[in-house]
Amino acid sequence: MSVWGRRELVLAGLALAAVPAGARGQAPATGPVAVPGDAVQGALVVGEVGPGAEVWVDGKPVRVQNGRFCFGFGRDAEKQAEVRVRFDGGREVTRLVAPQKRNFVIQRIDGLPEQYVSPPPEVLERIKRDAYAVGEARARDTDEMWFADKFIWPTDGPISSIYGSQRILNGQPREPHYGVDIAAPEGAPIIAPVGGIVRLAEDLYLSGNTMVIDHGHGVSTSYLHMSRIDVKVGDRLNQGQQIGLVGKTGRVTGPHLCWRLNWFQTRLDVALLSPPRKGDRA
């Protein structure tokens, strides 16, 4: 199945109790556990439980709000996730969810300025500070529920790179690509795909003008290489609100938006949450 058509599997695949039709946003009644056997690598999995239930994923407690919780599988996840639910009254159930393996392409990019492929020693400390700031922005665990809404695309343009591709930059192997690149022209508007709170908005060495938006429960999206940032840290955003413009700042060969998704520090595939677009490829 194409990655562009897996939203329903990702968002609705983990149902820990039956949800009546038309009851979105209402916690289901306590009932038998029904969990699919798998979710693809890179998926954000959203589950629902009954009132008062507590949830642990791989032994760690996760936030439950209005019956909803989530967790994610990274690009290279192989181990099954153990989901343990304790219902109000003490009854517990446990289910295993296995990450389904995906095949990722190799992508070669040449013509990058050498200082961005092999940064000089004098900028390595800045790169470390940048990474720390991004990590702090992605570490928020708020009780907002925007992550469970339907995402829209933040800008228009062809997809030039997909999640998970193994990158070779100027002939040198580097870590995989963890975003979706949208080849929009410089100055094209970027909008919020769902509601959220701005947690980071600054110029970083490798990713240029960069923004991180918190969507609740540890789910965040990031926007890289922007030419302009139109909002500030702490702003609450509505879906469709303009947040900046497409650019070519940082380590790039041309204008585009690199759009990313995280569950805390786990890097996920934002395309799995986005509606399919005509002409997109798997």
Residue ranges and their predicted role:
Residues 19-22:
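C-terminal segment of classical bacterial N-terminal signal peptides
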Residues 78-81, 103-107, 266-268:
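Short, charged/polar, Gly/Pro-enriched secondary-structure boundary elements
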Residues 25-41, 87-169, 279-282:
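Polar/charged, compositionally biased leader and regulatory segments
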Residues 1-17:
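N-terminal secretory signal peptides and thylakoid transit peptides that target proteins
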Residues 51, 75, 99-103, 165, ...:
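Non-catalytic surface loops within mature trypsin-like serine protease
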Residues 26-44, 48-101:
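Ser/Thr-rich low-complexity repeats and stalk/linker segments
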Residues 152-282:
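Catalytic cores of peptidoglycan-degrading enzymes
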Residues 66-69, 98-102, 226-229, 273-276:
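A short, sequence-level motif marking secondary-structure junctions
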